Amino acid sequence: MKLHTLRPAKGSVKTSKRIGRGTGSGRGGTSTKGHKGAKSRSGYSSKIGFEGGQMPLQRRLPKFGFKPLNKIEFKPINLDELLELIEKTGASVIDTALMNQNGLIGKNDKVKVLARGEVKSIKAEIIAHAFSASASEAITNAGGKVTLIG
């Protein structure tokens, strides 16, 4: 056995259909595409979602929902994070600038304070864009002050 004498096993290689090589080949003329119509033309490819003239699924189903253009997104900050910030900095006023300096929020973020974490006592004024009802209650009960921005 030599490399130049190697052949594939019998029946393992299928001969390809030679289409459009004259009428004598058996596959000439219309080249297995039938007569006329879009599918017989060169460059034809079916449209994605085309269902043969039936109204396609993406057009049968209704549109729904929208995204409001003027939605205000708040960055949630929890009380336990604020307590850590107070311990770390020792500040008596916690505002957005201080939160930004310590990496809690971005420069243009609006802040909403949420009530996760236990609060024993807060001797600080917390300034934010919004507070949850339970967070503002927890802060005032612990001796802190709540101030809303605009």
Curated annotation (Swiss-Prot):
GO terms for molecular function: rRNA binding; structural constituent of ribosome. InterPro entries: Ribosomal_uL15, Ribosomal_uL15/eL18, Ribosomal_uL15/eL18_sf, Ribosomal_uL15_bac-type. It holds the Pfam family Ribosomal_L27A. It comes from the Bacteria. GO terms for biological process: translation. Residues 21-31 have a biased composition (Gly residues). Keywords: Ribonucleoprotein, Ribosomal protein, RNA-binding, rRNA-binding. Residues 1-51 are annotated as: Disordered. HAMAP family: Ribosomal_uL15. Binds to the 23S rRNA. Belongs to the universal ribosomal protein uL15 family. Part of the 50S ribosomal subunit. This is Large ribosomal subunit protein uL15. It comes from Cytophaga hutchinsonii (strain ATCC 33406 / DSM 1761 / CIP 103989 / NBRC 15051 / NCIMB 9469 / D465). The lineage of its organism: Bacteria, Pseudomonadati, Bacteroidota, Cytophagia, Cytophagales.
